[in-house]
Design a protein with these regions (language model features):
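Short, charged/polar, low-complexity loop and linker segments
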Residues: 12-29, 34, 92
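Solvent-exposed, non-transmembrane helices and loops of integral membrane proteins
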Residues: 13-23, 104-144, 217-220
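Alpha-helical transmembrane segments and their immediate juxtamembrane boundary regions
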Residues: 44-98, 146-206
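Cytosolic/matrix-facing juxtamembrane and C-terminal tails of multi-pass cellular membrane proteins
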Residues: 202-220
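Membrane-anchoring/interfacial helices and their immediately flanking loops
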Residues: 2-12, 79-120
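Cytosolic juxtamembrane amphipathic/interface segments immediately preceding
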Residues: 29-41, 144-146
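Alpha-helical transmembrane segments of integral membrane proteins, especially early/N-terminal helices
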Residues: 10-14, 40-50
């Protein structure tokens, strides 16, 4: 396989790039790599904070349940805690998705710079990863993967937990309203969780479709 630059040419240019251009390109490459690291760190950090909050909240809910013998205090605390955790999950999901989209854009820009390297130094083809321009992101595992890929992202994981929290809150509310009916609680909880999960996954897929078709450069 061969890697092609922006001009789809592997031939040696008539002249070497100016030293200033080389400096600009390498600096931009380094900056983009740093930006990618920041997006990854932010996504994992936010997800860790969210999961920590969920873990602590559920432990507290369990203690309240034991202390109140699953009485009024348990339901009151649960109806406050679970929607709050679901909201935290929603904003974490949205920001993790934004970070993923930003990382995708940085990756495309880095691959553009790699095309510049191969254009002016084609002898590097035997030493650096060299694939056709249209296959670069797929080879790196960025994008693709079908519908299941959405569940493998940080945003997808947070979305699943958030949907479960929303369903749990709805089930708890249904149990209170229906006089502690298990059937009503299960039906309401499952329905809300499924609807929330489908909406979040569709929202994420739409965001990825938009960024995948967006043109960052005129000749794309």
């Amino acid at each position: 396989m061969s890697d092609r630059g922006p001009n789809n040419s592997m031939e040696q240019p008539d002249s070497s790039p100016r030293p200033a251009a080389v400096t600009f390109v390498t600096t931009e490459h380094f900056t983009l790599q740093g930006a990618r690291s920041q997006t990854i760190a932010e996504s994992t950090g936010r997800a860790s904070m969210f999961l920590g909050a969920v873990s602590g909240g559920l432990v507290a809910l369990g203690l309240i349940a034991a202390a109140s013998n699953v009485g009024a205090a348990f339901y009151a605390f649960g109806l406050i805690l679970l929607p709050t955790l679901a909201f935290v999950g929603l904003v974490t999901f949205d920001r993790a998705l934004q970070s993923g989209v930003e990382d995708h854009g940085y990756t495309r820009r880095i691959e553009r710079l790699r095309g510049y390297y191969f254009q002016y130094a084609p002898e590097l083809v035997g030493y650096l990863l060299s694939v056709p321009q249209t296959e670069r992101l797929r080879i790196q595992g960025v994008g693709g993967g079908g519908r299941w890929q959405g569940f493998l992202t940080v945003a997808g994981m947070v979305g699943v937990v958030t949907a479960v929290l929303a369903g749990s809150a709805a089930g708890l509310l249904a149990a209170v309203v229906s006089g502690h009916s298990l059937v009503a609680a299960l039906v309401a909880g499952i329905l809300v969780a499924v609807v929330a999960l489908l909406w979040l996954m569709r929202y994420q897929r739409s965001a990825w479709e938009r960024i995948s078709t967006a043109r960052l450069f005129p000749d794309e």
